[in-house]
């Protein structure tokens, strides 16, 4: 690698590469979430028989990981580049290695290891077999074949490739702190995100209102369940995401007991399962249109 790519150049390179592999380029979903997997572009689209190939950057908020902008690698909000392909191409690992090559990382010249790391998100009823991808000793990607989403079996097999953009960029730019990364045009990551990191950490650990958050969770849960009953899948899913983020804020404050924590997670999981079933039913009523489109293209 001669020229060190900025973060935005890394994003643009990955977008171009995966678009050439048949992925639609989506935008980040505008509700707080803890991982790119929780975007409806992955969570909902991974279930049911319809094909789906998409790539997008997803800001992911994890309140408990905030460190007031003082830790070089631990963040309240990090960015994932998410690729989801359904059905999974047989050569998905080769495609992934091709994406590294597009970034100037020749797999033949670097130590790239797929380390078994099966994945699960119990609160959303998700599980899969997968690997961490280590690049010269640093984990930069999570690679997963989904087995279950929202408590439903995933068929056809769906593959997910999740790049940790901060880690990958730190490797490419050879910096120790994410705040020293060049985002683009000479502007550093710290110039953009250090102050928000401090303020969100202060809120999460010191200023959040527990009583208000508990009421919000209850209200969001009630609305999500009501909307599922009304057949409004996507608004319902938004409220499930709000429940998840609200729980994460409560959890970060350290005021949730072990028993209460299990209860919150069970409530989120129940909603996720209901909305997953409702989504498949909705798509079936529509005649699984993307399946028809795919069959017509194959003729």
Curated annotation (Swiss-Prot):
One of its GO terms (biological process) is glycyl-tRNA aminoacylation. Gene3D superfamilies: Bira Bifunctional Protein, Domain 2 (3.30.930.10), Class II aaRS and biotin synthetases, domain 2 (1.20.58.180). Coiled coil: none annotated. It is an enzyme of class 6 (ligase). GO terms for cellular component: cytosol. It comes from the Bacteria. GO terms for molecular function: ATP binding; catalytic activity, acting on a protein; glycine-tRNA ligase activity; transferase activity. CDD domains: GlyRS_alpha_core (cd00733). SUPFAM superfamilies: Class II aaRS and biotin synthetases. It catalyses: tRNA(Gly) + glycine + ATP = glycyl-tRNA(Gly) + AMP + diphosphate. InterPro entries: aa-tRNA-synth_II/BPL/LPL (IPR045864), Gly-tRNA-synth_heterodimer (IPR006194), Gly-tRNA_ligase_asu (IPR002310). Its EC number is 6.1.1.14. Tetramer of two alpha and two beta subunits. This is Glycine--tRNA ligase alpha subunit. It comes from Pediococcus pentosaceus (strain ATCC 25745 / CCUG 21536 / LMG 10740 / 183-1w).
